[in-house]
Curated annotation (Swiss-Prot):
Membrane topology designation: Multi-pass membrane protein
Biological function: Probably involved in the export of the extracellular polysaccharide colanic acid from the cell to medium.
Signal peptide from the UniProt entry: 1-20
Gene that produces this protein: wza
A GO cellular component entry from the record: pore complex
Protein name: Putative polysaccharide export protein wza
Keyword Magnesium: no
Organism: Salmonella typhimurium (strain LT2 / SGSC1412 / ATCC 700720)
Cellular localization per UniProt: Cell outer membrane
Gene Ontology molecular-function annotations: polysaccharide transmembrane transporter activity; porin activity
Amino acid sequence: MMKSKMKLMPLLASLSLISGCTVLPGSNMSTMGKDVIKQQDADFDLDRMVNVYPLTPRLVEQLRPRPNVAQPNMSLDQEIASYQYRVGPGDVLNVTVWDHPELTTPAGQYRSSSDTGNWVQPDGTMFYPYIGKVSVVGKTLSEIRSDITGRLAKYIADPQVDVNIAAFRSQKAYISGQVNKSGQQAITNVPLTVLDAINAAGGLTDMADWRNVVLTHNGKEQRISLQALMQNGDLSQNRLLYPGDILYVPRNDDLKVFVMGEVKKQSTLKMDFSGMTLTEALGNAEGIDLTTSNASGIFVIRPLKGEGGRGGKIANIYQLDMSDATSLVMATEFRLQPYDVVYVTTAPVARWNRLINQLLPTISGVRYMTDTASDIHSW
């Protein structure tokens, strides 16, 4: 009796093995019994929501980004030509009356001109001998000079007056984000442009998204491409900065593409300043897996911007056939965009091999059970 039980043990083990093989690999989550909120477009046809384009040399050429060319900026030139600094509260002015040193406070060895100058009060005035308070806020230096000269003429014959700014403290622009030295920059009598501000901030960091710099002026945002400005000389991207302007250089976290499928290293890749081509993306993923990939099925899935895309389409899909290695020439010229998904499909033989690998334990278990049953029957 004991021997019979011992011989039944392999059969029981086989049955256990088979029952284990009925569990498919991977986790599962059933929606049965759960409150499923059905959407209005739940019955969508995904095939009708995408456009598929086989890559050809002509299509690659059509998709190539048009290079920015050098452009002048006549409006900026006019702004700079007519630019005049207007005094604000906190500025320090130096007033010199020639041949009347008693009206001029000289800067000594241990005192700078900003220490000895005339500070503009919060109410917009400054004090000057003989004439008392002088309203200076919002005025140019020539307007202030003319006002002081006219009022001093009551006390001094033909006064020769000179006015300059010893310290610019009232007006600032702010540079933040991915620059080497963020902070505030003074608005002075020298016009400050976007390019000047970036250079004064020590340039961009490696994490900067120089294509989507944001300038906030009077509560409104403008997008500026420093790539077009600095790399291609497109001066139309340059702007004159005014008091209170904020120049923000964002991180390039959104400049990424995804490489998935039958590659040696599925990856999320970040674009650098020069962008990324399809060949570079595949190379950074250590290439396609030659044993499992379908070289004719390399796809770039490009989401269409905006709700529903164009005409209800959500993505354009570009297919590259790399069965012929010379097609890599097209891949080298095909430039990726942020959030592109590069997907390499599986070869049919690889799918078959994976199916066989999943079935082998079951087949072996059935065979083992059959052999065991035969042994028991003969016993």
